[in-house]
Amino acid sequence: MTELARLKFYATQPHTCSYLPEEQATTLFLDPSQPMDVQVYADLSDMGFRRSGDHLYRPHCQNCSACVPARIPVNLFVPDRQQKRILKRNADIQVSSAKPVFTQEYFDLYQRYIEQRHADGDMFPPSREQFSTFLVRDLPFSRFYEFRVDQRLLAVAVTDLLPNGLSAVYTFYEPDEERRSLGRYAILWQIGEATRLQLQAVYLGYWIKNCKKMNYKTQYRPIELLTNQRWVTLY
């Protein structure tokens, strides 16, 4: 913690929240001149920070506490009946690890995903520059996990490999493959991978009760939520 005490942070001016438009958001960022050390990143993850591009951040809102950091303690996780069906349905998928680079194949999939699933969000319209700035970063702990069937790319789970767990940065997938539930499958796969690597948790970002796109995370039980600076387990 001594190392963390020396870090500098900066807060943004209040701005419209991208998850709850009726709220004003403030974001706390780690000083961008600070090298992104993997141990510092891991320690900050335990304090509710996330990575976006080259930045580590967490919500720092004055009048709202809706964004609750969430993680899955993988040694306690047991898939429910629906999750077992998703795992079985996707048993034909092969997963491989790749470096985070720009390829036309990745971008085409990302573009289809944003256009069909998030056309109402602040990431629309997708662009090559946006994709690269957000996801294609030359960081030693970052991975693109490719999900393929017969060489066809179905999904990419952008994941950070930390000493204390896997951080699920972002997943984009083939929007026409609804039956496969690829977003949920990617999380289940990350849980399995963290277990295989003997890591403690999968960090899912923020659970937001009143935001449909962010409240799905409590479907994975048990889950730990960071409340009053303490991780609380929900079974």
Curated annotation (Swiss-Prot):
<keyword id="KW-0012">Acyltransferase</keyword>
<dbReference type="InterPro" id="IPR030700">
    <property type="entry name" value="N-end_Aminoacyl_Trfase"/>
</dbReference>
<protein>
    <recommendedName>
        <fullName>Aspartate/glutamate leucyltransferase</fullName>
        <ecNumber>2.3.2.29</ecNumber>
    </recommendedName>
</protein>
<dbReference type="GO" id="GO:0008914">
    <property type="term" value="F:leucyl-tRNA--protein transferase activity"/>
</dbReference>
<keyword id="KW-0808">Transferase</keyword>
<dbReference type="Pfam" id="PF04376">
    <property type="entry name" value="ATE_N"/>
</dbReference>
<comment type="similarity">
    <text>Belongs to the R-transferase family. Bpt subfamily.</text>
</comment>
<dbReference type="GO" id="GO:0004057">
    <property type="term" value="F:arginyl-tRNA--protein transferase activity"/>
</dbReference>
<dbReference type="InterPro" id="IPR007471">
    <property type="entry name" value="N-end_Aminoacyl_Trfase_N"/>
</dbReference>
<dbReference type="InterPro" id="IPR017138">
    <property type="entry name" value="Asp_Glu_LeuTrfase"/>
</dbReference>
<dbReference type="Pfam" id="PF04377">
    <property type="entry name" value="ATE_C"/>
</dbReference>
<dbReference type="GO" id="GO:0071596">
    <property type="term" value="P:ubiquitin-dependent protein catabolic process via the N-end rule pathway"/>
</dbReference>
<comment type="function">
    <text>Functions in the N-end rule pathway of protein degradation where it conjugates Leu from its aminoacyl-tRNA to the N-termini of proteins containing an N-terminal aspartate or glutamate.</text>
</comment>
<dbReference type="InterPro" id="IPR007472">
    <property type="entry name" value="N-end_Aminoacyl_Trfase_C"/>
</dbReference>
<dbReference type="GO" id="GO:0005737">
    <property type="term" value="C:cytoplasm"/>
</dbReference>
<keyword id="KW-0963">Cytoplasm</keyword>
<dbReference type="InterPro" id="IPR016181">
    <property type="entry name" value="Acyl_CoA_acyltransferase"/>
</dbReference>
